[in-house]
Amino acid sequence: MAMVTGGWGDPGGDTNGVDKAGGSYPRATEDDSASPPGATSDAEPGDEERPGLQVDCVVCGDKSSGKHYGVFTCEGCKSFFKRSIRRNLSYTCRSNRDCQIDQHHRNQCQYCRLKKCFRVGMRKEAVQRGRIPHALPGPAACSPPGATGVEPFTGPPVSELIAQLLRAEPYPAAGRFGGGGAVLGIDNVCELAARLLFSTVEWARHAPFFPELPAADQVALLRLSWSELFVLNAAQAALPLHTAPLLAAAGLHAAPMAAERAVAFMDQVRAFQEQVDKLGRLQVDAAEYGCLKAIALFTPDACGLSDPAHVESLQEKAQVALTEYVRAQYPSQPQRFGRLLLRLPALRAVPASLISQLFFMRLVGKTPIETLIRDMLLSGSTFNWPYGSG
């Protein structure tokens, strides 16, 4: 069951449950599919009827009447979505924001129904314009809002670039390393950290545009950005982090630090954990992680680049891709893009030396991680750890 309020917003946001337009709560028994499947009185120019084609509504599973606002839906879900957008409505879930939406329960919670409409790809802008473009956005449509002096996006369409970033992932999606929240031992922490480092190099090797760069540029970019990529991977993989095993892995129990240095070190540990936690609270999805990692990877500040301007243009492509993706997928979270982008400077503030000491001291000893990354990248193999502690 959901309450309706004036002022359309993203289903992920909270509302106060008051109808600002002065209307009453919608009746839970009202069925939005009252109009017959063949009705055309409210047809939009962007709707595509499919007579004779048996396709289910992707929102509720009822029989669809065609393609509406980008996806196949029934007349009921089409009308509900159009009404929600045109009347600028938003809803509040009275349960846990995970209500079942099917043919029999679709009218019980408007919040979760609208949330599912967006999740399956229904387009808010298609309602506002009365039609939906069939082609992918071209270069002119891919510039970030208000951008000046930014090179237009001339690479693959935004959706294709993100698809390439997702395909570059060497492991399944978030939570891939499990852990279930249990406190891991030192060896487990180090093993998971090694796998995260492997995945960082493997992802970069298959990321769009990166393989075409000169080998020296590839090494320079990874040597500079590996710690940021590691933190992003740790957050994406939901790596279970607990202070005690981290400190043990860093060798602090065997060789205690001076008090002043230990306090500073603990502050850095907390800063690292805080960055991972903040990414978790933002509920960053896989596509956003891919874009953030690409923005971090293509840093024109890396030393010795043969063409820093080209690397900067690649970074801009990833940033534009993130802009367009967030705008399309989270249309009523206008601050989301800024919040995501602000994570990157904070990640860079986490010292690479801290990550090395926390996670890799037992595995590589005094061997610099940057040397290890260079060797893995140039050898073409990340799953053969060539170093021992010493």
UniProtKB/Swiss-Prot annotation:
Coiled coil: none
Gene name of the record: Nr2f6
Residue positions where Phosphoserine is found in the record: 35, 41, 84
Gene Ontology terms describing biological process: detection of temperature stimulus involved in sensory perception of pain; entrainment of circadian clock by photoperiod; negative regulation of transcription by RNA polymerase II; neuron development
Region ranges (Important for dimerization): 314-390
DNA-binding region of this protein: 54-129
Function: Transcription factor predominantly involved in transcriptional repression. Binds to promoter/enhancer response elements that contain the imperfect 5'-AGGTCA-3' direct or inverted repeats with various spacings which are also recognized by other nuclear hormone receptors. Involved in modulation of hormonal responses. Represses transcriptional activity of the lutropin-choriogonadotropic hormone receptor/LHCGR gene, the renin/REN gene and the oxytocin-neurophysin/OXT gene.
Sequence similarity: Belongs to the nuclear hormone receptor family. NR2 subfamily.
Assembly and binders: Binds DNA as dimer; homodimer and heterodimer with NR2F2 and probably NR2F1. Interacts with THRB.
PROSITE patterns referenced in this protein's UniProt entry, alphabetically: NR_LBD (PS51843), NUCLEAR_REC_DBD_1 (PS00031), NUCLEAR_REC_DBD_2 (PS51030)
GO cellular component, one term: nucleus
Pfam families per UniProt: Hormone_recep (PF00104), zf-C4 (PF00105)
Mutant lacking the gene: phenotype: Reduction of neurons in the locus coerulus of the developing cortex. Defects in circadian behavior. Hyperreactive lymphocytes, late-onset immunopathology and hypersusceptibility to Th17-dependent experimental autoimmune encephalomyelitis.
First and last residues of each zinc finger (NR C4-type): 57-77, 93-117
Predominant cellular place of this UniProt entry's protein: nucleus
Residue span, NR LBD domain: 157-380
Region of interest (Disordered), residue spans: 1-50
GO-annotated molecular function: DNA-binding transcription repressor activity, RNA polymerase II-specific; RNA polymerase II cis-regulatory region sequence-specific DNA binding; zinc ion binding
Compartments reported by the entry: Nucleus
Skewed-composition ranges (Gly residues): 1-15
InterPro entries listed in its UniProt record: NHR-like_dom_sf, Nucl_hrmn_rcpt_lig-bd, Nuclear_hormone_rcpt_NR2, Nuclear_hrmn_rcpt, Znf_hrmn_rcpt, Znf_NHR/GATA
Highest taxon in the source lineage: Eukaryota
Designated name of the protein: Nuclear receptor subfamily 2 group F member 6
UniProtKB keywords: DNA-binding, Metal-binding, Nucleus, Phosphoprotein, Receptor, Repressor, Transcription, Transcription regulation, Zinc, Zinc-finger
Species this chain originates from: Mus musculus (Mouse)
